[in-house]
Amino acid sequence: MFSVLLFGCGGGGGGSQGGSAGLIGFAGNSSGQGGSGQSGGTASGGTATGGGTAGGGTTGGDPSPIPSTTALVTRLGKPARVLLGLGAGNPLDQMKSQDIHPDIVDTYLVGVGAGAWPTWNSPDGAYITYTAQAIQAYGAVPMFTLYQMATTGEGNMSAVNDTAFMTGYWAQVRLMYQRMAALGTPVLVNLEPDFWGFVAAQAPNRDAAQIAAIVSSQPECSALPNTAAGLGQCLVQMGRQIAPKALLGFPPAFWSGTPAEIAAQMRAVGAHQADFIVAQTTDRDAGCREVPSPPAECTGRTGPFYWDESNQTSPNFHESQSQISAYRAALGNGLPILWWQTPMGVPSTTPGGTDLHYRDNHVDYMLRNAQEYGDTHTFAIVFSTGGQFQTSITTDGGQFARLSSQYLARGGATLK
C-alpha cells in the first residue's frame, strides 16, 4: 500500500502521485497556481536552552555564536558539513546495494482516517517506529513529511473547519509526535507541503488569519485562534510539548507574491518559530515536462524546464538560491535551509527522455557545487522523486552513488 502512497505530495495535481510545487519560475504548481530532554538544546522561535539553537546559539559557556546550520547538524549527531538525504522512490535496499549512505532519509505520512498512515502497521502509528528504527540502523536521521491536508483534495479549505476531519487530523498529528517522542532521538518533520500555498491563494488578502479552522480544541493550543494561522502555530506548539526532540520545518509555496510577501504569510502560521526552512527545489525531472506527450504528473506548466548551469539564462540555480535567501532574510530568526524533493535525473544535451530516465541536472550541479549551498545557510539537501515516473537511484545509472561518494571524499561543503 504505502509504496504508492509515498508519492503523496501533489503540488496541486490531485491524487497520491503528484509532486510538490516549487519556486515560481522554476516549478510552480501543476494546478496552475502561479506558473524531551534535549539533545543539544531545545529550539523554540529561534531561541535555545542547553547546547544550541536552530537559529544560532552558544555551547559550553562559549560566548561565540554558533551558526544555525552547525547548531542544527550537531543536534542531529552528524558531521559539520552540508548533509545529503534521500526520500521517496529510493528504497533502503537500493541504498545498501549501491553502498549509498545518506545522512537523512525522508518518508511521507499521508491520509486521514481509513487507510491513512497510522493503519499501515499495528499498533496504530507503529509505521513511524519501524521506519525510523530501520533508517537509524542504517546510520541516517529519519525525516517525515506530514502530508495529511491533501486527503480531501488539494486546496480544499473546507476541511480545516470540518469537525469530523479535523478530529481525525489532530489525533494523527498527536500520534505522530507521540511516536517520535518515544524514539528518544531527533527526527526532522516537514509540515504540510503545498498546503500553505493554497491557504494564501484562497485567503482574503492572502491572510491565513481570515480562514476559519478548528484549532483550540487541542489542549496544547487552547489559547490559539481558530484560523489557518492558528493551525500552523498549533503544529509547532504541539510538537514542542509532546516531542521536543523533533525538529520542525515549514515549506513555503512561492505562488502568492514576492519572497518578502510570502515570508509575511508564513510568519502568520508560525514558520519563523520552527527549526528550519524547507526549500522545495522542484518536483519533476526537467525532461518529463519536455517530451511531446508527457505523463499526467508532468503536464500543466510552461518551460523552459532545464536549468542553466552557467547561471546566465533563466531558470538557473543562482536564481533559486537568491529567492530562498530573500525569503529567509524576510522570515527572520536566521533559520537554516533544507532543500527538499530535489529531482534525480541525469544531465543530457537532448531534451526529454523516457519514463524513469528523464534528463535533469540538479544532482549533478548541486553535488558538484555544494559549497554554494553551504554558503547560503543550507544544512541539508534531500533528493527524491516527485512522482512515479521520475528518476531514482534505481534508474539513474549510478549517478547519485558516484557523485555523493565524490562529495564525501572531498570532505563535504562547509556550513555557514
Task: Show where each model-derived region lies.
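Aromatic-lined carbohydrate-recognition surfaces of secreted/lumenal glycan-active proteins
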Residues: 190-192, 219-262, 279, 332-347
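Boundary/entry segment of secreted carbohydrate-active catalytic domains
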Residues: 60-113, 119, 381
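Structural preference for beta-strand elements that scaffold enzyme active sites
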Residues: 81-83, 102-106, 139-143, 186-190, ...
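Substrate-binding cleft of secreted/luminal carbohydrate-active enzymes
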Residues: 77-88, 141, 281-285, 315-416
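Ser/Thr-rich, Pro/Gly/Ala-heavy low-complexity intrinsically disordered linkers and tails
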Residues: 13-64
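Substrate-binding cleft of extracellular glycoside hydrolase catalytic domains
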Residues: 114-237, 241-244
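Aromatic- and acid-rich polysaccharide-binding/catalytic face
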Residues: 102-107, 263-312, 383-384
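C-terminal motif of bacterial Sec signal peptides marking the signal peptidase cleavage site
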Residues: 5-8
